Regions:
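Hydrophobic alpha-helical bundle segments that form small-molecule/ligand-binding pockets
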Residues: 116-118, 128-154, 191-203, 207
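All-alpha amphipathic helical-bundle segments outside canonical DNA-binding/catalytic cores
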Residues: 82, 122-126, 141-159, 176, ...
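Hydrophobic alpha-helical connector segments
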Residues: 56, 70-101, 151-158, 200
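Short, basic, alpha-helical segments at the C-terminal edge of helix-turn-helix-like DNA-binding modules
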Residues: 59-65
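Amphipathic alpha-helical segments used for helix-helix packing
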Residues: 83, 98-119
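Helix-turn-helix
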Residues: 6, 10, 14-52, 56
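C-terminal regulatory/oligomerization modules of transcriptional regulators
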Residues: 85-86, 90-93, 153, 169, ...
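Amphipathic C-terminal alpha-helical segment
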Residues: 94-97, 159-177, 188-198
Length: 212
């Protein structure tokens, strides 16, 4: 990698860390250059505006959803359906390890900048769509859900459950709201699985067709 690309990557990494730890609006460009160990001229060369840097950070998340979010869970959990709960548990662990300071990086940014930076909104939505894609694929690979369940809708429901649970846990500075939401969510999914098993079970006394 050239020194030019290394400098650009250092700036993106610094911005990503600061946005996650203290928020987009609370992060100044001077902080980013100091955190990255670069001169301000380098920052403005790559990112003329702060929104340009925001978009670069969102691009990073989009390109690294597997390595940054899914890989750890997928490598230790083979069952596709349990991978969904493993991903959710990853957010739980982040909340606890950071004393509720960090949640979902994209969710945090949406709350801060979706109105003030509409140019970044499509990329935020793309990040959410990728998350939903991954969860939907887990549901599909599991083969455990009823055929009449819309797997895309269920994946969106998973995302909204996670985002709401993270937000409440951070607000209360307590993991209980997160756990309560996930317990109810798991119960719902397990009921769907049970329904699928019930409908697929052979009946003991099948009804004979009517004689003509």
């Amino acid at each position: 990698m050239s020194e030019t690309l290394k400098t650009r990557d250092k700036i993106i990494e610094a911005a990503r860390d600061l946005f996650l730890n203290q928020g987009y609006n609370s992060t100044g460009l001077a902080q980013i250059t100091q955190h990255a160990g670069v001169k301000s001229g380098s920052l403005y060369y790559f990112f003329p505006t702060k929104e340009d840097l925001l978009i670069a950070v969102l691009d990073f998340y989009k390109a690294n959803i597997y390595d940054g979010l899914l890989k750890f869970t997928y490598e230790r959990i083979s069952d596709p359906l349990e991978r969904v709960f493993g991903v959710l548990d990853g957010y739980r662990q982040m909340l606890l390890m950071t004393n509720f300071e960090m949640g979902c990086p994209i969710g945090n940014l949406v709350l801060e900048v979706t109105n003030s930076h509409p140019g970044a909104r499509p990329l935020m939505n793309t990040n959410f769509d990728q998350w939903v894609d991954a969860i939907e694929e887990c549901f599909r690979q599991s083969g455990k859900l009823p055929e009449n369940v819309d797997l895309r809708d269920l994946a969106v429901f998973t995302l909204t459950t996670m985002e709401g649970a993270v937000m409440l846990a951070r607000s209360y500075r307590d993991i209980a709201p997160f756990d309560q939401a996930i317990v109810q969510y798991r119960d719902y999914v397990e009921r769907l699985v049970a329904d699928a098993m019930e409908w697929s079970r052979p009946r003991a006394n099948p009804i004979s067709p009517l004689e003509p």
